[in-house]
Amino acid sequence: MLTYDTWEEPAITFPEDDSYKGALSVLKWAYGHYGDQLVYACSFGIEGIVLIDLISKVKKDAEIVFLDTGLHFKETYETIEKVKERYPGLNIILKKPSLTLEEQAEAHGDKLWEREPNQCCYIRKILPLREALAGHPAWLSGLRRDQGPSRANTNFLNKDDKFQSIKVCPLIHWTWKDIWRYTSKHELDYNILHDQGYPSIGCEPCTSPAFTAEDLRSGRWNGMAKTECGLHE
């Protein structure tokens, strides 16, 4: 089994010229290789909706983890409920941080995300995902290369030093237009905030409409020297 400890640049190739740009081939390999040990950490943005639909073609009872920070838009929770209705076999887990927002405010001060967003992300996202991935050799992510400069070199299979795991990214060759074409063709429900100028959706206090079409994550952490929550750095 390919794991963090046995990692070598994989001699595995996936076709990129099919209608899925390699995504379905990657998923079939990943679930065939890891089975129930493979976890999808999903934010339920538009890429996540597409990837869930593809996953459902391969493993109808896949485990999907949502990092429930307690700060998400209500529209995000509404999207999760729609996904549950469409794919009743999926095992969707809402993973909460060990600290409630009240406990975090007591320990670190109110609205930590405004003063120390990196620490807030660490408490409410990184630590919970680390717990969720414990004992799992690999996880899925919906990263795409054209989401921004920090993701341009993502591969199908990646050695993930942060979580000491293998990060599998089936959608790396999909463009923003590919995502929306697939969504429309298959009539997938998605977060309505995408129709209101939010191409990338995270926690409500740290998410604004995008400022530029060239960087779909330009609406995240507005005014701060920060473009990632830390999960993919």
From Swiss-Prot:
Substrates-to-products reaction catalysed: [thioredoxin]-disulfide + sulfite + AMP + 2 H(+) = adenosine 5'-phosphosulfate + [thioredoxin]-dithiol
EC number: 1.8.4.10
SUPFAM superfamilies: Adenine nucleotide alpha hydrolases-like (SSF52402)
PANTHER family, per database record: PHOSPHOADENOSINE PHOSPHOSULFATE REDUCTASE (PTHR46509:SF1)
Protein name per Swiss-Prot or TrEMBL: Adenosine 5'-phosphosulfate reductase
GO cellular component: cytoplasm
Cofactors: [4Fe-4S] cluster
Family: Belongs to the PAPS reductase family. CysH subfamily.
Keywords assigned: Cytoplasm, Iron, Iron-sulfur, Metal-binding, Oxidoreductase
Main function: Catalyzes the formation of sulfite from adenosine 5'-phosphosulfate (APS) using thioredoxin as an electron donor.
Record-level Gene Ontology MF annotations: 4 iron, 4 sulfur cluster binding; adenylyl-sulfate reductase (thioredoxin) activity; metal ion binding; phosphoadenylyl-sulfate reductase (thioredoxin) activity
Pathway membership: Sulfur metabolism; hydrogen sulfide biosynthesis; sulfite from sulfate
Cofactor note: Binds 1 [4Fe-4S] cluster per subunit.
GO terms, biological process: cysteine biosynthetic process; hydrogen sulfide biosynthetic process; sulfate assimilation, phosphoadenylyl sulfate reduction by phosphoadenylyl-sulfate reductase (thioredoxin)
Pfam families: PAPS_reduct
Chain positions recorded as [4Fe-4S] cluster binding sites: C120, C121, C203, C206
Compartment(s) where it occurs, according to its Swiss-Prot or TrEMBL record: Cytoplasm
Residues forming the catalytic site: C229
Stored InterPro entries: APS_reductase (IPR011798), PAPS/APS_Rdtase (IPR004511), PAPS_reduct_dom (IPR002500), Rossmann-like_a/b/a_fold (IPR014729)
